[in-house]
């Protein structure tokens, strides 16, 4: 697998521990020359206690700091939104890889598919497609990685790196890569570290 350019047309919402930190994020971004995409404030259309602020990075990606009552505690990303040229094709792709990747699919609305894993979720919505993205999901076994690759390539999705160990990343790193319908690289990886054994 080769190096990729930076992602485009992506939305990432980062966890902020307080409303004050949301405000600090936005003010620092504006002072740093980032474009405003939504000043700090409540957004009750999302959730009653949702408070967020939005900036655009130099590539046009939407970057948000968000604080609300049901924030994830095990990571820095609250949510991710991908855009796709063909929502039905993306739904089929994630449906194919879901069993081996430990994911399940929820249709939240006709134009909104949510992919849910054990430690978070992301949304897929129609629009000019996200590009240049590499997204990896954890696997508990090398066999799950093999099955992920076999299922995806067997369904006609393009190989982006066959199952195998990649010691350049770290000892025990076992991953496989396929391309989603929009050409983004999706990986399943078993880190084979003591916690995984």
Predicted regions and their residues:
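Intrinsic disorder/low-complexity detector
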Residues: 5, 73-75, 197
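Residues that flank catalytic or metal-binding motifs in active/ligand-binding sites
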Residues: 8-10, 51, 76, 131, ...
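Long, continuous compositionally biased terminal/linker segments
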Residues: 1-3, 8-10, 113-155
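A short acidic/small-residue loop/turn micro-motif
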Residues: 44, 68-71, 167-168, 191-195
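Short, contiguous alpha-helical
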Residues: 56-63, 179-195
């Amino acid at each position: 697998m080769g190096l990729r350019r930076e992602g485009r047309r992506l939305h990432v919402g980062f966890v902020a521990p307080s409303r004050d930190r949301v405000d600090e994020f936005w003010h620092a971004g504006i002072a740093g020359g980032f474009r405003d995409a939504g000043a700090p404030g409540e957004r009750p259309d999302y959730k009653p206690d949702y408070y967020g602020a939005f900036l655009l990075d130099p590539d046009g990606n939407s970057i948000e700091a968000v604080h609300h009552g049901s924030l994830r505690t095990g990571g820095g990303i609250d949510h991710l939104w991908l855009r796709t040229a063909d929502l039905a094709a993306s739904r089929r792709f994630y449906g194919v890889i879901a069993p081996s990747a430990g994911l399940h699919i929820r249709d939240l609305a006709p134009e909104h598919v949510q992919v849910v894993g054990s430690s978070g979720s992301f949304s897929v919505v129609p629009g000019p497609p996200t590009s240049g993205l590499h997204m990896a999901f954890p696997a508990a076994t090398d066999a799950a990685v093999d099955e992920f690759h076999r299922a995806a390539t067997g369904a006609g999705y393009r190989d982006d790196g066959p199952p195998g160990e990649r010691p350049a990343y770290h000892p025990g790193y076992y991953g496989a890569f396929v391309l989603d319908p929009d050409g983004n690289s999706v990986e399943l990886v078993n880190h084979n570290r003591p916690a995984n054994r």
